[in-house]
């Protein structure tokens, strides 16, 4: 377990970067977040959690939820059913690209871009009677926090600005790769993105990625092989179009969200969550990436 002093050092080390990024402003509910927040939490495979800075302040997890939705799909479907509808390759395009969906005849490159996550949400919608409730149940169980909830204001705000995601879904539907009612699936998808969690919640919830598929309670969520495969996808595609830069600087599987959160994993050791709302040009937390880079260097850890 890293010492508290190290986590505090990491937070202070990146504080001078505040003001250099830009808070997501495409929906009003995200634009109003205090840009000066910085938080970090780590959870070890022994189940201990430690944090520094604003690590107990909840934020909108946004695309980090795509890890949970894929994990849930892996518990409900044969893998062949999932991977026949979504790929495993980095995209090289923006996370909400229509061009790639058109060029590749409705099959998204990976489950962590919007098109891929919409296919996963479509799969969940068709298999579950109450997909929103099931997701909430899962993240509460994984984080050991039954107060985790959806931010309805964020979900509604995203729905009101959903034209592009609807276009992606309808385009995939035209190629036969979207089964459900687009509006219903979009509402589910936006609720997933609108989960509100803090760094401590997320570092606990993602522990299964560091612990061979076992959650913080020791329950097996997915198999050891599936966990390794999921971490591989996170290493290649988890950071939008900045995955290569992140691998170079941080050297861990990770997933970011435009709410400013990033989760990262040192397999066999610990799961980490950082939060700083200001984003870089790729939509990844600017100071968050720097916190993970500094922590990785100080711990001497990298998967490479």
From Swiss-Prot:
Keyword Oxidoreductase: no
EC number: 3.5.1.2
Principal EC category: hydrolase
Pfam families associated with the record: Glutaminase (PF04960)
Annotated positions binding substrate: 63, 114, 158, 165, 189, 240, 258
Signal peptide boundaries: none
Superkingdom to which the source organism belongs: Bacteria
GO biological process, one term: glutamine catabolic process
UniProtKB keywords: Hydrolase
Catalyses which reaction(s): L-glutamine + H2O = L-glutamate + NH4(+)
GO molecular function: glutaminase activity
Spans traversing the lipid bilayer: none
Subunit architecture: Homotetramer.
Family listed: Belongs to the glutaminase family.
Protein name per Swiss-Prot or TrEMBL: Glutaminase
């Amino acid at each position: 377990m890293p010492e508290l002093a190290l986590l505090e050092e990491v937070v202070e080390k990146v504080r001078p970067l505040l003001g250099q990024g830009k808070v997501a402003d495409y929906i009003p509910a995200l634009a109003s977040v205090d840009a000066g927040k910085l938080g970090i939490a780590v959870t070890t495979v022994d189940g201990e959690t430690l944090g520094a800075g604003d690590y107990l302040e909840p934020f909108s997890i946004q695309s980090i939820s795509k890890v949970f939705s894929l994990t849930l799909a892996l518990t409900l479907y044969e893998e062949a059913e999932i991977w026949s509808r979504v790929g495993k390759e980095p995209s090289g395009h923006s996370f909400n690209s229509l061009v790639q969906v058109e060029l590749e005849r409705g099959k998204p490159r990976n489950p962590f871009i919007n098109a891929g996550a919409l296919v996963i949400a479509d799969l969940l919608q068709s298999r579950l009677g109450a997909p929103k409730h099931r997701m909430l149940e899962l993240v509460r169980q994984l984080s050991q926090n039954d107060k985790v909830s959806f931010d309805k204001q964020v979900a509604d705000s995203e729905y009101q600005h959903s034209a592009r995601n609807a276009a992606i879904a309808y385009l995939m539907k035209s190629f036969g790769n979207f089964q459900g009612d687009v509006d219903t699936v979009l509402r589910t998808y936006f609720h997933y993105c609108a989960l509100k969690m803090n760094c401590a919640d997320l570092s606990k919830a993602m522990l299964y990625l560091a612990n061979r598929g076992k959650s913080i309670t020791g329950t097996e969520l997915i198999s050891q092989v599936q966990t390794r495969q999921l971490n591989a996808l996170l290493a290649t595609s988890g950071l939008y179009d900045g995955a290569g830069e992140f691998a170079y600087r941080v050297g861990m599987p990770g997933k970011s969200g435009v709410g400013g959160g990033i989760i990262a994993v040192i397999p066999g050791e610990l799961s980490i969550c950082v939060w700083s709302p200001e984003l870089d040009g790729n939509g990844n937390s600017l100071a968050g990436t720097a916190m993970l880079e500094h922590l990785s260097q100080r711990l001497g850890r990298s998967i490479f």
